[in-house]
Amino acid sequence: MSTLAVVGAGPKGIAIAAKARALAAAGLPAPRVVLVDRGEVAGNWTGRQGYTSGLLPLGTPPEKDIGYPYAPSWGDASAGVVAAMAEYSWQRHLIMHGAYSDWVDRGRMRPTHRQWSLYLREVAAAAGAEIVRGAATSLDIGDGGRWEVRLETGDMIVADGVVITGAGPSVTVPGQPRDHPMVQDGRTYWLAAHELRRDRALTVCVVGSGETAASVVIDLVKHCHKHSTIDVLTARGVLYSRGESYEENRLYSDPGEWPRLAESHRREFLERTDRGVFSLQAEAVLNQARGFRTLAGRAAEIEAREHDVILTIAYGDERQRVAYDAVVVAIGYDARWFEGLLGENAGVRYRAALGDGELARVIDVDLSVSGLVPPLHLPVMAGLAQGPGFPNLSCLGLLSDRILRRYVADNKARALTAKRSEHA
């Protein structure tokens, strides 16, 4: 049996573990799936590790759960796999808690992040997910050609494939201090928000134009002193919103036609629907807010002083230094953080597979880096090449199908070889 190591015990990791359990229940030779995480299961959704207060609404409909879109992807075994995955559905979770009819009658409200984390933890437990505690400190390829995942605990997991999930560290601005109460990022803001919810008016600048920034801005609008001033710094000086339509949503759920689109059109689609846009719900809140404005430019430098924070704003050839009481840098997370974990052998093979190309362009159908053996699966980088739903929560069931298929095929081939050897 092959082993698949997943760095991160969040939605993607849990979806893969649950699907492996469903495949095994349907009689398919699923791999052993090991989830590696330094914190608790679904910890980034609880509010205890930053990234959210835990009370923010889920950005996607909860029906797009661990098994969505429940596609018949496994031939004759498909019905059994889909039925097994239905046991891990959001609706099943509500039914077991006696909350299904209430949820329907209230208009299928989106759960909070904390409620979503409880669902994820229940799925992980029900699926019997194997979870190893500890941070991954090194990913290298051993003499046997398999991955060696080393942990801070000193343990090592040997695996036939590795999946990288979860947000990387926050992207920073030059001069941004690591530990200053009035300079925060998209993760730490939620751990220090009380510093900005004071009884006096503050001037705050939020740097960013995506959903991370939107969540921070809405929280500030709701909880800061009513006379506070909140600036949002974006490259274009305008907050664009994303409307939803069947045609857009279809490509998130079923990206079969996605690779056939011209790359320029795929990039435009991602720009319009997934990157640098506020949701309509966020825009509705901000449309009613006072003391809120947008500025054009980029954050060129931060200077944190004792009583204020100086933000240098660059726009074209102009540079302006503006003093704020606080600055929140919410420009996203480093999706390529895993590169710092790659050991010598893995680094050489990874760079050879990448060549002079852009990483986002060389992600294969199974969400791995094309040409890299053993496979390294990077769903967060798969949006451009394979479909817009893979980096987020829009098609977790399809994501797990894509990744697990090669390991099921490998296990079948090994079993067939072993059987032939017995009869030789």
Regions found by a protein language model. Give the residues of each.
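Conserved N-terminal glycine-rich FAD pyrophosphate-binding loop of Rossmann-like flavoproteins
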Residues: 39-79, 239-256
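Flavin (primarily FAD) cofactor-binding/catalytic cores of flavoenzymes
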Residues: 1-40, 45, 102-211, 215-424
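A conserved beta-strand/loop capping segment in the N-terminal third of enzymes
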Residues: 68-103, 109
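Amphipathic alpha-helical interaction segments
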Residues: 53, 82, 96-98, 124-130
